[in-house]
């Protein structure tokens, strides 16, 4: 997958996931994260806005969970596509269905609202029709949130 486009922007128009609050390219009111593959890891940077806060100056935990959910799922699906040789950036590209089954989150420290966040996700286990992803959110080089996410990919089996 050599495209410089964000993974979310490779999802064909008309797919329902494009309206997702967290990662939907067509949701003007959503978080609109942009994930990219760097070797075997999904990486995104994202900047919160004032309305994403919990306590003054800190990111809301639900927003952090949404960032992890969406980034982990799109990373798992894109890496699956890479494994099977499916081109996501071609004229007739298709994006396999997938969804988050479970998320286990550890909030390690408050996530500062003003920092540019880096989100990193890596597949750590392959099941027959699922991928387990380790995902973390970093602010100023410090890990703030760590999660394990199980993503179901029906076409993987």
Feature locations, PLM:
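HotDog/MaoC-like acyl-thioester-processing domains
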Residues: 1-12, 102, 109-157
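A generic structural signal for short beta-strands and their flanking turns/coil linkers
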Residues: 40-42, 61, 99-103, 115, ...
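Low-complexity, flexible helical/coil segments
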Residues: 70-72, 79-86, 104, 139-141, ...
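Hydrophobic residues in beta-strands and at strand termini
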Residues: 46-48, 107, 153
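A conserved, well-ordered hydrophobic junction motif at loop->secondary-structure transitions
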Residues: 43-83
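Non-catalytic linker/capping segments at the edges of enzyme domains
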Residues: 1-56
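Short, solvent-exposed coil/turn segments
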Residues: 28, 98-100, 130
């Amino acid at each position: 997958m050599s495209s410089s486009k964000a993974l979310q922007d490779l999802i064909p128009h008309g797919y329902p996931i494009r309206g997702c609050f967290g990662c939907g390219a067509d949701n003007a009111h959503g978080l609109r994260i942009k994930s990219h593959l760097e070797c075997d890891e999904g990486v995104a940077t994202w900047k919160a806005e004032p309305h994403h806060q919990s306590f003054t100056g800190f990111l809301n935990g639900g927003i952090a969970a949404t960032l992890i959910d969406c980034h982990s799922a799109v990373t798992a699906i894109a890496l699956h596509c890479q494994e099977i040789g499916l081109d996501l950036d071609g004229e007739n590209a298709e994006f396999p269905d997938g969804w988050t089954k479970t998320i286990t989150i550890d909030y390690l420290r408050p996530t500062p609202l003003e920092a540019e966040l880096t989100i990193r996700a890596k597949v750590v286990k392959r099941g027959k029709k699922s991928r387990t992803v380790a995902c973390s959110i970093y602010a100023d080089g410090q890990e703030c949130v760590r999660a394990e996410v199980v993503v179901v990919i029906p076409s993987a089996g």
